[in-house]
């Protein structure tokens, strides 16, 4: 009997799973993080923004513009049409506005067009200007009240408080070394804390002590806050003190001071906590959080019945809090009302909630805990009750009551998703528009004005366009494979506007925090400067309405201490109150715990507790990691650094033409493929009626017919082949949501990023030294690792000042051979095989009349006027871009296509390349075991197994021990056994096959029990000395292919200033011979090599032309001249005002340009120019008519002229034409 149990993944794949824990909670939809947020934006977000900004009234109050409703009309293009036309997939937004004239009572209602709103596709992306983009969610600090504590140089703890709004002024409290408390209003100079309380209307010391009770800090602060001006009351003086800090030097009155404070903190247009800020303030100051763990100093009773809820001396634990929590939300439970003086900022009574507890440090001492009462969530401004409660928390913190906040705690960081980011952007646009509306209201005639005349939509359209086009959070979608796409949509970035910058982010913010558990993946993050700042959402995590990450837990009954199937989603700060056991904790059949002492998590500690103290248990082990990390089998056996690489490598895997699902999987592959958006899903139950490569038809149970069109050979964002293949056959029954067609990198409805080759851990003639990989030729011949790549090239025919460009077959100086695959319009035919430099689209551009060179004068003499008119600006195949023309698309204004201004015709050519695996390509497994192909050996030379099976890949065994990614060894043993048994297996992360399971499985498969075998040398037939570990590992071909990287320069462009060759493959540049390389030649004394590298091969302009001429003629190369960089240095020093001259050995001044001149020739005339001049004189000596006749009859002159022109172009290195190339 085999280990494990059979699990079906979709309709087409069965695996034997080693999991022991039952999945009681299905995975949430993995793209909901995007789609749900955008749905909220359309349903509620847009309305919220309009309600915030409108109604708008003019200064005199004559006119009021109000929002009624909005609707989106049908999009102009479908998703596919948007891609094809380089358009944005969007819908016109029409807003119904109501304009009321208060003088006449007239009401005008009108629909106003508010621009196009980009729409989200079903899979959670946007199409902007034809390219697919993703809006990455942002991880930012939440608005709320935060408490901090630092130790000064004397070892004394100094506390601070910050009240951070979503929008508006900050309020900060702090203590100094003398234990006096201060307040800062909006980052200004500090004032004694009591000044703020007095400004609220509580002027006397006795009132302040009545509210806050006795405290050493408070007494010291009151002593510091002396009454300076007896003419003013304490309240008026406090208001003026704050005014003086906010507006120093300005004349102040009590009224102006009061109105300034009101506008800063109590005006909804200037100060906004947002719903999340109000929730955080209420939560932080609530007595629910503050009472836990303290002993009551008074009896708490039901205010209605008088029933005792908790007696004095009761310790408030979770069970007591369960009884109290509903009462703490009531307005009549332990509330106290304080009445401020009429001079205060807000003269209304202030109601707070107060409960007394005993101090932990001095047991008999009573401490008063004040909460802000129950303030409704729609109160977005700060209230006097909030200020009093936050001051109380701050003062009691110094008595040891309360907690300081950790800013990296996920309870204090929230997610801004696409809906909220779009809403904020729209609010910016509407706020700009509001100013325009007010201005127009005062200018226009009130009797005749309409809403349309008041609105200017440009600011709104501009802000939305700017967000999608250039925001740091709007990113070009990673479309290497479905996993990369899915991960991109689930990414969380701490960068971007309002977030961190990578230069200022320290180690703490990048580090894994204990609150990441089940919320953010501790493994998947980029290597490099963004490490820790960009994270991935964990598999089961969801985002609540406030933007906080929540993770599910199974509740443990407090009565029976058994694990129930009730699921609670907890935020990070809720989780802090509970003790949580791991999902792997052994349970009995009835849900009770097997062991008497269980290792659990509580905050950042691991604690050993008895079962009666456990509150929750994890739902499933894989809830800790992201989707990509959950696709790594035996993740628990890999070092975390290598697991990080393994997660990142999977996203870089290239879609292969015939992929296979992994023999050893984790069970996550099916959901990753299903939710990625690349698979075609059935929309309803039914039966398949017809299937071919392009279309699937399904007859529903109600007899309606659904037709599904498959995407064939479309270019993805990453220039990979996006291709769908049917996964069903005629007569199959399908169910709603079933995968009926595989996307790229999918097989049988599962993610299939690579192949399952036979792998041996052995060295082979040093060819796999230092992570190099040796492959069998079988992988090349049988197209095991062959992928298809599609690149597109555009050619635009524009209007120029000298006339329109023309797409044509009539190209000057081009032989018929170069035009053989062009049609009558000069466009390449579909199916043509093209190579570097071939013409794809023939195009000519009108020339201006300029001074003609010798060659041009010659051509003009031969061909008359026509040669002067146009120059060849055809689209050619770039270096390394050769392949087969897959498709050609032509867009013209006449056909009604939308083109950029000045463009008359756009031709887009798609070239497809079939790339086999080759030496230099990067490959990797799923455990961070990456390497580069160093040798592709013939099959007959490969080591082979005793049954004659040749090995496909040889990996270096030295790559395992130091990297500590032992998962790959367990994978090859399990994979070998699975292949022997002809089955697929699943080993979920942290709940998969143990080492014993692997060896049991190996024995049952009849494979050698040590996982090793005798391996024979394919060349000699001799067995290797030792037994070798051989098995099956899932191995991927990555997107870093040698074809994209390899590059060599012949003649190419030069930098304009330094005249040195440009750098980089894209510029067809050279290899930089830098400072250290010069030292190397100096060290060897290679003087002449050094000289030619610094002159001819770099920036000696004249010398390199002469060298070229000498090589062409077969003469000796002349001495080098002066490098251009020397002239640049001279000019730079002269620009600093230094009189720098060049002297010869006799100390006579030498002109730099004279140093380049030869006695008998000018520097600018090169060999080819002189050849062309001689040819011109010779030709002119003959009769013109005779020459013309010869040209017509033989066409040979045309060929000669083309050759001369081509040679001349080659030599003119610093010419304009060359630079443009």
From Swiss-Prot:
One of its GO terms (biological process) is DNA-templated transcription. Residues 1176-1221 are annotated as: Disordered. GO terms for molecular function: DNA binding; DNA-directed RNA polymerase activity; ribonucleoside binding. The keyword Transcription applies. Keywords: DNA-directed RNA polymerase, Nucleotidyltransferase, Transcription, Transferase. HAMAP family: RNApol_bact_RpoB (MF_01321). The RNAP catalytic core consists of 2 alpha, 1 beta, 1 beta' and 1 omega subunit. When a sigma factor is associated with the core the holoenzyme is formed, which can initiate transcription. DNA-dependent RNA polymerase catalyzes the transcription of DNA into RNA using the four ribonucleoside triphosphates as substrates. This is DNA-directed RNA polymerase subunit beta. It comes from Lactobacillus delbrueckii subsp. bulgaricus (strain ATCC 11842 / DSM 20081 / BCRC 10696 / JCM 1002 / NBRC 13953 / NCIMB 11778 / NCTC 12712 / WDCM 00102 / Lb 14).
């Amino acid at each position: 009997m085999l280990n494990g149990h059979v699990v079906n993944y979709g309709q087409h794949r069965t695996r034997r799973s080693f999991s022991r824990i039952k999945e009681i909670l299905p995975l949430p939809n993995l793209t909901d993080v995007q789609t749900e947020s955008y749905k909220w934006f359309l349903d509620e977000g847009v309305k919220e923004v309009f309600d915030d900004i409108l109604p708008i009234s003019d200064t005199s109050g004559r006119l009021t513009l109000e929002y009624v409703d909005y609707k989106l009309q049908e999009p102009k293009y479908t998703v596919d049409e948007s891609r094809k036309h380089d358009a944005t997939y969007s819908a016109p937004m029409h807003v119904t506005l109501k304009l009321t004239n208060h003088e006449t009572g007239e009401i005008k209602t009108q629909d106003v067009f508010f621009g196009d709103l980009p729409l989200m596709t079903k899979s959670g992306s946007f199409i902007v200007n034809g390219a697919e983009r993703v809006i990455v969610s942002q991880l930012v600090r939440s608005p709320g009240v935060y408490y901090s504590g630092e130790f000064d140089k004397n070892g004394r703890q100094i506390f601070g408080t910050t009240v951070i709004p979503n929008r508006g002024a900050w309020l900060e409290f702090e203590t100094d070394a003398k234990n006096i408390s201060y307040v800062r209003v909006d980052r200004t100079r500090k004032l004694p804390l009591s000044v703020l309380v007095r400004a609220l209307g509580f002027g006397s010391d006795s009132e302040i002590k009545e509210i806050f009770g006795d405290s050493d800090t408070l007494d010291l602060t009151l002593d510091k806050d002396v009454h300076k001006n007896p003419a003013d009351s304490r309240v008026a003086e406090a208001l003026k003190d704050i005014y003086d800090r906010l507006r120093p030097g300005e004349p102040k009155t009590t009224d102006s001071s009061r109105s300034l404070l009101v506008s800063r903190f109590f005006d909804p247009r200037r100060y906004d906590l947002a719903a999340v800020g109000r929730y955080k303030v209420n939560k932080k100051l609530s007595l629910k959080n503050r009472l836990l763990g303290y002993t009551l100093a008074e009896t708490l009773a039901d205010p209605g019945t008088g029933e005792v809820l908790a007696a004095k001396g009761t310790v408030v634990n979770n069970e007591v809090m369960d009884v109290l929590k509903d009462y703490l939300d009531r307005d009549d439970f332990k509330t106290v009302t304080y009445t401020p003086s009429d001079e205060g900022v807000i003269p209304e009574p202030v109601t707070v909630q107060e409960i007394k507890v005993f101090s932990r440090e001095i047991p008999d001492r009573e401490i008063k805990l004040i909460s802000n009462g129950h303030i409704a969530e729609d109160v977005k401004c700060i209230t006097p009750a909030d200020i009093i409660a936050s001051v109380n928390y701050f003062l009691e913190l110094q008595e040891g009551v309360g907690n300081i906040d950790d800013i990296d705690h996920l309870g204090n960081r929230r997610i801004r998703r696409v809906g909220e980011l779009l809403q904020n952007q729209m609010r910016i646009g509407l706020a700009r528009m509001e100013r325009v509306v007010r201005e127009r209201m005062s200018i226009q005639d009130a009797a005749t004005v309409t809403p349309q005349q008041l609105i200017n939509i440009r600011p709104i359209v501009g802000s939305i366009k700017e967000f999608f086009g250039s925001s740091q959070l709007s990113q070009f979608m990673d479309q290497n494979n479905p996993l990369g796409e899915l991960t991109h949509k689930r990414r969380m970035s701490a960068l971007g506007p309002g977030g961190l910058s990578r230069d200022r982010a320290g180690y703490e913010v990048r580090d894994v925090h204990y609150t990441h558990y089940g919320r953010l993946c501790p493994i998947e993050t980029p290597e490099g400067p963004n490490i820790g700042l960009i994270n991935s959402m964990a598999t089961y995590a969801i985002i609540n309405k406030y933007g906080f990450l929540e993770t599910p837990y199974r509740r443990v009954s407090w009565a029976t201490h058994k694990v129930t199937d009730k699921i609670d989603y907890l935020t990070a700060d809720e989780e802090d109150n509970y003790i949580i056991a791991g999902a792997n904790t052994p349970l009995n059949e009835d849900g009770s715990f097997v062991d008497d002492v269980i290792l659990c998590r509580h905050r950042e500690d691991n604690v050993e507790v008895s079962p009666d103290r456990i509150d929750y248990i994890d739902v499933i082990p894989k809830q800790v990691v992201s989707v990509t990390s959950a696709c790594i089998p035996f993740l628990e056996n890999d070092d975390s650094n290598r697991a990080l690489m393994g997660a990142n490598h999977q996203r870089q895997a290239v879609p292969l033409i015939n992929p296979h699902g992994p023999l050893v999987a984790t069970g996550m592959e099916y959901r990753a493929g299903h939710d990625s958006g690349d698979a075609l899903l059935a929309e309803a139950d039914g039966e398949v009626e017809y299937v071919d490569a392009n279309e699937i038809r399904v007859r529903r149970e109600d007899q309606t017919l659904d037709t599904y069109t498959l995407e064939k050979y479309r270019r993805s964002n990453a220039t990979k082949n996006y291709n769908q293949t049917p996964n069903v056959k005629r007569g199959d029954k399908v169910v709603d949501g079933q995968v009926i067609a595989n996307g790229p990198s999918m097989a049988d409805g599962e993610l299939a990023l690579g192949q399952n080759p036979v792998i041996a851990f052995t060295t082979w003639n040093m060819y796999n030294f230092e992570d190099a990989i040796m492959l069998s030729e079988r992988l090349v011949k049988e197209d095991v690792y062959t992928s298809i790549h599609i690149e597109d090239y555009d050619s635009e025919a524009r209007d120029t000042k000298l006339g329109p460009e023309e797409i044509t077959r009539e190209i000057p100086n081009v032989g018929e051979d170069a035009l053989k695959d062009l049609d009558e319009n000069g466009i390449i035919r579909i199916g043509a095989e093209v190579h570097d430099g071939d013409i794809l689209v023939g195009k000519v551009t009108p020339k201006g009349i300029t001074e003609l060179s010798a060659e041009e004068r010659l051509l003009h003499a031969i061909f008359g006027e026509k040669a002067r008119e146009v120059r060849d600006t055809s689209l050619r195949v770039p270096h390394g871009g050769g392949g087969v023309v897959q498709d050609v698309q032509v867009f013209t204004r006449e056909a009604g296509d939308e083109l950029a201004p000045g463009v008359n015709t756009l031709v887009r050519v798609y070239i497809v390349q079939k790339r086999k695996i080759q030496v230099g390509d990067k490959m990797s497994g799923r455990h961070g075991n990456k390497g580069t192909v160093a040798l592709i050996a013939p099959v007959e030379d490969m080591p082979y197994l005793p049954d004659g099976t040749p090995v496909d890949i040889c990996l270096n065994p030295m790559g395992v021990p130091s990297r500590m990614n032992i998962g790959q060894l367990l994978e090859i043993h399990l994979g070998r056994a699975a292949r022997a048994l002809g089955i697929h297996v699943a080993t979920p992360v942290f709940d998969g096959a143990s080492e014993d399971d692997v060896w049991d499985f190996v024995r049952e498969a009849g494979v050698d029990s040590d996982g090793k075998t005798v391996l024979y040398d394919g060349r000699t037939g001799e067995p290797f000395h030792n037994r070798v570990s051989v098995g099956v590992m899932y191995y991927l071909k990555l997107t870093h292919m040698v074809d994209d990287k390899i590059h060599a320069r012949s003649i190419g462009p030069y930098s304009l200033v330094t005249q040195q060759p440009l750098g980089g493959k894209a510029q067809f540049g050279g290899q930089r011979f830098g400072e250290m390389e010069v030292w190397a030649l100096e060290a060897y004394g290679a003087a002449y090599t050094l000289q030619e590298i610094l002159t001819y091969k770099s920036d000696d302009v004249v010398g390199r032309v002469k060298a070229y001429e000498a090589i062409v003629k077969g003469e000796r190369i002349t001495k080098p001249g002066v490098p251009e960089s020397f002239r640049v240095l001279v000019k730079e020093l002269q620009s600093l005002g230094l009189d720098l001259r060049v002297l010869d050995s006799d100390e006579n001044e030498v002109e730099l340009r004279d140093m380049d001149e030869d006695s008998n020739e000018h520097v600018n005339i090169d060999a080819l120019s002189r050849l062309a001049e001689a040819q011109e004189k010779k030709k002119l000596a003959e009769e013109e008519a005779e020459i013309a006749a010869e040209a017509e009859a033989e066409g040979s002159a045309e060929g000669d002229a083309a050759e001369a022109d081509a040679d001349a172009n080659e030599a003119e290195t610093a010419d304009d034409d060359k630079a443009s190339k």
